[in-house]
């Protein structure tokens, strides 16, 4: 009998953990770059979608060629729009910020800017330098825009070795990271029709 009770408790616990990890109330945002082909008519018909983050820049010189067009289309269907910068470990923070600002100043947006921190294309072998540059970039964003930027990340490497962003709002890629950080503000929870789908509990938390 005791064995049966233990088994039942374990089963109930497993089910509870599964649903607590997998359930996301509402996917209400997308993030895109020049890699995405967006069907804006479908997005407009989806009344749950409230916001769209769009890639603006990367490193010291790359500027997404579709940024302005994506912003225009997103705003035309009434979405809140934000811009993000892809962080590069091999580029000084000042040069990265100058690149982002050059696009941000010319494109209308109303969401807190985002710094995208990922392993792809980066070398984290010099952890001290990566942290130093990211910390400085966060400071430059905060000085310019009056609030800490949201930091997107989703790899175990970034979460383990990069500490500079721990006091920033976090945008967590749940497809790769199964736990939630205390300051998680946005959750990237699914890919539908080649679009990253996200959940933000309160849109006011990310409005600039």
Predicted regions and their residues:
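Bacterial Sec-dependent signal peptides at the C-terminal "C-region" and cleavage site
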Residues: 15-25
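Short beta-strand/turn micro-motifs composed of small residues
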Residues: 85, 153, 174
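Glycine-rich, charge-decorated loop segments at or immediately adjacent to ligand/cofactor-binding or catalytic sites
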Residues: 95, 157-165
